[in-house]
């Protein structure tokens, strides 16, 4: 039985006649991400659309969607002000008109971050290490490991800045980190460059919090992501924590709480 082709929700009015039209990059349960053009500056931009949920009551739908898009935008604005590497907010709007028949969708236009998703960087590096088949000399291997350590410290640094600003990401994975690098078109089988600024993206689950528990859980989610997605790089995760300590003075308390979160995670794994 064939499935009907997916039809994304209609684009917001400001983007219905742009040239070129917005390009759909990803689609999730909560949002769709497009690459488009910022009309005022004619530069690339990221457009995140939170479509209306037809199964929700229209009033509740509009209220929740508006609340979530505003929360995401406020976190980004605060982080930009604090000097953390995140996309700048360019514009946003929500559709709250029309009574019970109104659309509850909302959209957020952000700075386009050029670079490689960190998940892809690590995947290419692990593929390079595997393809080398142990043929790397001691100096080459040490150089490769130093590259990974440097990137890990950069990740820890940007997460430390995030927490210092009083924001929790809520979904820290290597898919939500971008490395600003000119080495985008590297060929398969080559070792990727790991030099550049690390930028945090996708703040759909973010919120403002000063809770050490929330910060520790953020770090734990990132640690688990490395364990499940990048097993060869996982052994360097302590470098993330070193970078975190360098950029956030309150790190000692958070890292102590991280030990508790790890223990609870292990107990849940044992119980199943």
Swiss-Prot record:
A GO cellular component annotation here is: cytosol
| UniProt main location, coarse | cytoplasm
- Catalysed conversion reaction: L-seryl-[protein] + ATP = O-phospho-L-seryl-[protein] + ADP + H(+); L-threonyl-[protein] + ATP = O-phospho-L-threonyl-[protein] + ADP + H(+)
User: Which PANTHER family does the record match to this protein?
Assistant: EKC_KEOPS COMPLEX SUBUNIT TP53RK, NON-SPECIFIC SERINE/THREONINE PROTEIN KINASE
> Which keywords does this Swiss-Prot/TrEMBL entry list?
Activator, ATP-binding, Chromosome, Cytoplasm, Hydrolase, Kinase, Nucleotide-binding, Nucleus, Phosphoprotein, Serine/threonine-protein kinase, Telomere, Transcription, Transcription regulation, Transferase, tRNA processing
Tell me which family the UniProt entry assigns to this protein: Belongs to the protein kinase superfamily. BUD32 family.
Q: Name one GO molecular function term.
A: ATP binding
Q: Give the region (Disordered) as residue ranges.
A: 1-22
Q: Which residues form the active site?
A: 171 (proton acceptor)
From the broadest rank down, the organism's phylogenetic lineage runs: Eukaryota, Fungi, Dikarya, Ascomycota, Pezizomycotina
Protein name, entry field? EKC/KEOPS complex subunit bud32
Assembly notes: Component of the EKC/KEOPS complex composed of at least bud32, cgi121, gon7, kae1 and pcc1; the whole complex dimerizes.
In terms of superkingdom, the source organism counts as Eukaryota
What functional role does this protein have? Component of the EKC/KEOPS complex that is required for the formation of a threonylcarbamoyl group on adenosine at position 37 (t(6)A37) in tRNAs that read codons beginning with adenine. The complex is probably involved in the transfer of the threonylcarbamoyl moiety of threonylcarbamoyl-AMP (TC-AMP) to the N6 group of A37. BUD32 has ATPase activity in the context of the EKC/KEOPS complex and likely plays a supporting role to the catalytic subunit KAE1. The EKC/KEOPS complex also promotes both telomere uncapping and telomere elongation.
Domains as described in the record:
This protein is considered an atypical serine/threonine kinase, because it lacks the conventional structural elements necessary for the substrate recognition as well as a lysine residue that in all other serine/threonine kinases participates in the catalytic event. BUD32 has protein kinase activity in vitro, but in the context of the EKC/KEOPS complex, the catalytic subunit KAE1 switches the activity of BUD32 from kinase into ATPase.
Pfam families membership: Kdo
Q: Where does ATP bind?
A: 25-33, 48
| PROSITE patterns for this protein | PROTEIN_KINASE_DOM (PS50011), PROTEIN_KINASE_TYR (PS00109)
Q: What is its EC number?
A: 3.6.-.-, 2.7.11.1
Please name the source species. Answer: Aspergillus oryzae (strain ATCC 42149 / RIB 40)
Subcellular location, record wording: Cytoplasm; Nucleus; Chromosome, Telomere
Q: Which GO terms describe its biological process?
A: tRNA processing; tRNA threonylcarbamoyladenosine metabolic process
Q: Please verify whether the record's keywords include Kinase.
A: yes
Q: Where is the Protein kinase domain?
A: 19-272
Cell membrane found in the keyword field: no
């Amino acid at each position: 039985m064939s499935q009907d082709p997916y039809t994304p929700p209609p684009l917001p009015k400001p983007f219905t006649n742009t040239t070129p039209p917005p390009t759909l990059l990803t689609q999730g349960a909560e949002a769709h991400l497009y690459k488009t053009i910022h009309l005022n500056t004619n530069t690339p931009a990221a457009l995140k659309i939170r479509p209306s949920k037809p199964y929700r009551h229209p009033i509740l739908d509009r209220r929740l969607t508006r609340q979530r898009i505003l929360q995401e935008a406020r976190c980004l604005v605060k982080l930009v002000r604090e000097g953390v590497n995140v996309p700048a907010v360019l514009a946003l709007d929500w559709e709250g008109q029309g009574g019970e028949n109104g659309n509850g969708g909302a959209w957020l236009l952000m700075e386009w971050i050029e670079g490689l998703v960190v998940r892809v960087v690590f995947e290419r590096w692990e593929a390079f290490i595997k393809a080398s088949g142990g043929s790397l000399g001691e100096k080459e291997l040490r150089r490769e490991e130093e590259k990974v350590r440097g990137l890990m410290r950069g990740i820890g640094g940007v997460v430390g800045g995030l927490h210092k600003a009083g924001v929790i990401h809520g979904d820290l994975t290597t898919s939500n980190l971008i490395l600003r690098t000119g080495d985008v078109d590297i060929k398969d089988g080559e070792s990727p460059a790991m030099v550049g600024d690390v930028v945090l993206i996708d703040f759909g689950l973010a919120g403002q919090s000063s809770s050490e528990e929330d910060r520790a859980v953020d770090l734990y989610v990132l640690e688990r992501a490395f364990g499940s997605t990048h097993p060869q790089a996982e052994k360097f995760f302590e470098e993330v924590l070193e970078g975190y300590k360098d950029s956030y003075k309150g790190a000692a308390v958070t890292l102590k709480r991280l030990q508790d979160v790890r223990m609870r995670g292990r107990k849940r794994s044992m119980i199943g």
